[in-house]
C-alpha cells in the first residue's frame, strides 16, 4: 500500500472533502441524473450526459480520497525533535543567494500544497533540496530556470 504523508490539518481537510462529496455532492448529482432522465431520449440529452460526467468525476475523487486516507501517514511536526533540521511539516525561511530575496514555505503533503499560500509539496524540487538540511546550510536546487542556491535562514516548527 502506498503511503501518503500529510499533516493533521491536511488529513482533516481530506476527511471534510470526502464527507462533502458523499453527503452533499453525490446525492445532488444523482438527483440531477434522475431529473434529466425524465426529459426523455437519453441519446440527445445534454443534461443527462453532463450529470453522468459529473458523477464520474465525483466517484473518482471519492475513490482517490479514500485511497489517500487509507494510506495516510499523519506526521505532526509538533511531536518531532526541534533540532533546526528541515523536515516534513515545518516552515522554512530561505534566502536566494543571488537576489537576497527571502521566502517562507511550509513543507506539506501533495494534497495540501498551495504555492500561493506558501505551502509546497514534500515531493517538490525545493522541498527535496531542503529536507535534512539545517539552519545556516546552503542548498543547490534545480529549478526550471536552472540551479538556484538558497541559504536556510530559519526553521519554524509550527
From Swiss-Prot:
What GO biological process terms does the UniProt entry carry, in alphabetical order? DNA-templated transcription elongation; regulation of DNA-templated transcription elongation
Question: Which PROSITE patterns does the record match to this protein?
Answer: GREAB_1, GREAB_2
* A GO MF term: RNA polymerase binding
Spell out the HAMAP family in the cross-references.
Answer: GreA_GreB
NCBIfam families per UniProt: greA (TIGR01462), PRK00226.1-2 (NF001261), PRK00226.1-4 (NF001263), PRK00226.1-5 (NF001264)
PANTHER family in alphabetical order: TRANSCRIPTION ELONGATION FACTOR GREA
> What protein name is recorded for this chain?
Transcription elongation factor GreA
What organism is recorded for this protein?
A: Psychrobacter arcticus (strain DSM 17307 / VKM B-2377 / 273-4)
Q: Which gene encodes it?
A: greA
